[in-house]
Amino acid sequence: MGNFPLIYGFRELVAGAGFVAGVTVSGRALVKHEEDGWWVYGVEPGGIAERGDNEQEAYLNFKQSLREVLADSAVLNSSFQSFRADVEDLGRQRNEVWAAEWEIAREALRTGELKPEGAFAELPRETGAVLTGISALELPKPTAEDNAVETTLLAAA
């Protein structure tokens, strides 16, 4: 199988100096099988790539790295406002090389040239526009409902 265009999303609670934030991440990634294993390359946000022995492990490692970047941002920023600006900026970062390959892979999936295998065969397909970004909402009085963690994995087609 060639490159695979992935759309992902999740929510995360992030605590910083005097604040708790609900963070929503919506992104695109390119999944590739390389000689040394499976890799997930961040398209939006860009700048993050992780490896695994299979596609699921690579994605989980990628997601964990993104979570660590969010946690690091909370440590480095002294206020919610600066944290929000930082993570929103991260969400706008785009890797143009992987973006071009992602579009090629999406078109290959649409035309049937790319045949999803394994875990990819079961993913629902998204054929519309893909909105990406990171948003943060300050939670002045966090509740148990704020713990809801949504995870979205879609194939871009």
Regions found by a protein language model. Name each.
Residues G18-V20, G37-W39, E55:
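Generic structural signal for short, flexible, solvent-exposed coil/loop and linker residues
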Residues V25-G46:
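Short aromatic-glycine-(Arg/Gly/Cys) micro-motifs in beta-strand/loop hairpins
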Residues V43-E57:
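A short, exposed loop/beta-hairpin motif centered on an aromatic-Gly-Thr core
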Residues M1-L30, L60-A157:
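Short, charged, surface-exposed hinge/linker loops at domain edges
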